[in-house]
Design a protein with these regions (language model features):
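Short, well-ordered beta-strand elements within core beta-sheets of diverse protein domains
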Residues: 33-39, 54-60, 146, 256-259, ...
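Rossmann-like NAD(P) dinucleotide-binding subdomain of oxidoreductase/dehydrogenase enzymes
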Residues: 122-266, 393
Length: 480
């Protein structure tokens, strides 16, 4: 399946210099999907030169032409949604319907940035001197390294590629080795849409080797990474050596707060969708469930009734709602965390094991814990899987304090019919994104990102493009 691709450098698919490959595994079957091309140092250097050349073309391309190309990419993504979604199911394991939704979200991001490229506004300020003028310009930062994770390869590649292109930058994409095909297909669409040679490049292979060499180069001026906080800190240290600009969206550990005055059935529906999307392997997945104590039993009953009905299986099969975890390592880590949580004193209400009837595949049942305390490991570390710890709270102020007692700050969820609590919660919760009475967070038109050790910078919304632009100020005398 990967034979038509390889490394994408200077507008062409080409095999890696050393002709090396690596296996890509289908998490639903544990079978090899195919062998993907593995880049060497020679390929990285070729991509850097290609991106440097492409930058000179793209930054001098008129914004309206850049907008046209970005819009064309969005249109092609929608036309080829089934092809892209199939890659997501084969490589990530998510159900086809979820894959189609992800492709739609990625297309929306390209469409949004197609318009943003027309709206890079400068400024003219009144000078203190009558015979001078003050002008402010925004110019592309340069070559961007886009480090793309495996859990949402299409939508996260779309955020990075489209914003870079809108700003007039060229980009080198590095997909994860778990999911290279999805990003390769997207890059092929960029070529079909008319992106000039060298403007978008792709390197597939060892993540650490490629990232290190890209960041060691003076050509790369900005890095955008979505990944774990551990990896983000490594990238940040590397970026410091070259003073490269960095956008970082790292780990999350979202609280899900349910107040006593809500419709429990509606909230349970939102919780099921949010928690088990991509089998919990989502940076904004609800992970810490705080239920006001007098509604706890009702919520747990409603939630478990729905969780038990989720159809587990291969995402290619009709009606499947919960696919496998993405790797054998991820499955092992979930099993280890379940045992740790039980040993710390939690009670398993449902799940806690691999489902029966599957000889192959990295499947795990939706798992709900009771008798959980705030100091348990599962409350401190992002599980990245279908695990649901249930806790209770008495007062609103108490739960806000407990929800904020974490080093991560990507997203928070709050459900209440009190306008006072809704407004105070949105202001007091320590996260870059807050969802009040909705489960929808990631929108093309909204700034997505976190605070604390979740990182900094934003993707989406009207401000994201500024992270890909340099500010230039000119103080101009009218004569001399």
């Amino acid at each position: 399946m990967y034979s038509k691709f390889g490394q994408f450098i200077d507008g062409k698919w080409q095999q890696a210099e050393k002709k090396e490959t690596y296996d890509v595994i289908n998490p639903a079957t544990e079978e090899v999907i195919g062998k993907a091309s593995k880049a060497s140092s020679v390929d990285v250097q070729k991509a850097l030169k290609s991106a440097e050349k492409g930058l000179e073309v793209w930054k001098n391309t008129a914004p309206w032409q850049r907008s046209y190309v970005l819009r064309k990419i969005a249109d092609l993504m929608r036309e080829k949604k089934d092809v892209l979604a199939k890659w997501l199911t084969l490589e990530v394991g998510k159900p086809l319907a979820e894959g189609v939704g992800e492709v739609g979200g990625g297309a929306d991001i390209f469409e949004w940035n197609a318009e943003e490229t027309k709206r890079i506004y400068g400024q003219t300020q009144q000078s203190r001197f009558p015979d001078t003028r003050v002008h402010v310009y925004y110019q592309p930062v340069g070559v961007v390294a886009a480090l793309i994770p495996w859990n949402f390869p299409i939508v996260l590649a779309s955020r990075k590629i489209s914003t870079a292109l809108a700003a007039g930058c060229s980009v080198i994409c590095k997909p994860d080795t778990i999911t290279p095909g999805a990003v390769m297909e997207l890059v092929d669409i960029c070529k079909e849409a008319g992106v000039p040679d060298g403007v978008v490049n792709l390197l597939s292979g060892d993540p650490a080797e490629i990232s290190n060499e890209l960041m060691d180069s003076d050509i790369v001026k900005k890095v955008s990474i979505t990944g774990s906080t551990r990896v983000g800190k490594i990238i940040l240290k590397k970026a410091a050596d070259k003073v490269q600009r960095v956008t970082m969206e790292l780990s999350g550990h979202s609280p899900f707060i349910v107040c006593e005055d809500v419709d429990i059935n509606k909230v349970a529906d939102i919780a099921i969708t949010g928690k088990f999307r991509n089998n919990g392997q989502v940076c904004i997945s609800p992970n810490r469930f705080y239920i006001q104590e007098n509604r706890k039993d009702e919520f747990v009953s409603a939630f478990m009734d729905r969780a038990k009905k989720l159809k587990i299986g291969n995402g290619m099969d009709e009606g499947v709602e919960l696919g496998p975890l993405s790797t054998a390592k991820r499955l092992e880590e979930i099993e280890k965390l379940v045992e740790t949580t039980k040993n710390e004193g939690a009670k398993v209400l449902i799940g806690g094991k691999r489902p029966s009837g599957f000889n192959k595949g990295y499947y795990y049942e939706p798992t709900v814990f009771d008798d959980v305390k705030d100091n348990f490991t599962i409350m401190k570390e992002e599980p990245f899987g279908p695990l649901v710890p249930i806790l209770t709270f008495k007062s609103f102020d108490e739960v806000i304090e407990r929800a904020n007692d974490n080093d991560l700050g990507l997203c928070s969820y709050l459900y209440t019919n009190s306008m006072d609590q809704a407004h105070r919660g949105s202001e007091l919760l320590e996260s870059g994104c807050v969802a009040v009475n909705t489960g929808v967070v990631a929108l093309a038109e909204a700034p997505f990102g976190g605070i604390k050790q979740t990182g900094y910078g934003r993707e989406g919304g009207s401000g994201a493009i500024k992270d890909y632009l340099n500010v230039k100020y000119t103080h101009m005398g009218l004569k001399i």
